């Protein structure tokens, strides 16, 4: 749940409202919840049945065949993750820079680029060593996030105005093509806010009684975050009229909407304190993400399923420095784009291989390995899996065509890279593999 509660709730509300130009955009957030709950059942079945570390990398290999198409799917997962992981980190950098704009009055675009670069380099430098435990980091991150969240919710509850919160524009629910395109955009923002609901699956071998704990962890964390995010959404839109920060691109103050809210209610001094808390939360979040994400390409390379370069350890400090530098550098560059573009690219890049791939994978395993031990079996199978699949297709299809082409292009390049790598190592499909 900690990874689900970084800077997300403080930076996405203007984007969410801008997607459909009004509070009806919260419908997209509900659609995202339905998709995530159904997809969470997919993760739960896979995680409970195969509770080793690796998550998607492990599940995709087993579902599609570890020495054949599973190698391709595992490779493509890591390939897209080298981009989608940094995109997620970059969203935190962007959020950090946006809220810094409340304190740094008149911050220019060039200043934002410099600030993101400095924060990104500091993040890499702090992680350029062996770190045995992130318990202290996680606790401090969670404490800062919880304090800020509770403060925002309490302030919103005491000043909530339903007329402001539910001020729907004319034709808010006309169900036109534009309505569904906007719904798709709002859903992508909602899914971004939920990202991390599956993180327990990446440490499955460290979980006691995974068949019981993993499904419960996914359900409880998703439900808790849904309630918290809904409360934050209502706290803000019930205090500040949405027309004052929609569209987000035309209202610079939308970059630090929580700071604006606190300033109106309690003055600039309290707003500055909350801004500093959000900056702390944002940095703690990107620190934890870069630490965890830099280990995924390393683990894949070490097990022989990705380029060996990413499996290199620092000669004296014994940490995956190549993977850290690559993920860290891409994160900085990705931070130069707009938050909306970064979120769209992040979600679309993960959909095809990771999310849709796993839905298909759980169905393949049901057919190919009916006797596999499944401590948790998806309720009402295959309905949740099909709902998740249709949801991912909807989110993908309603994305800007340029982002779709970008996502497909990334996977196409990954396919070419896989073939070149397999040819150089004489592995499948260039070497016969026993069935």
Predicted regions and their residues:
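TM-loop-TM module centered on a large, flexible mid-protein loop between adjacent transmembrane helices
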Residues: 13, 58-66, 101-106, 217, ...
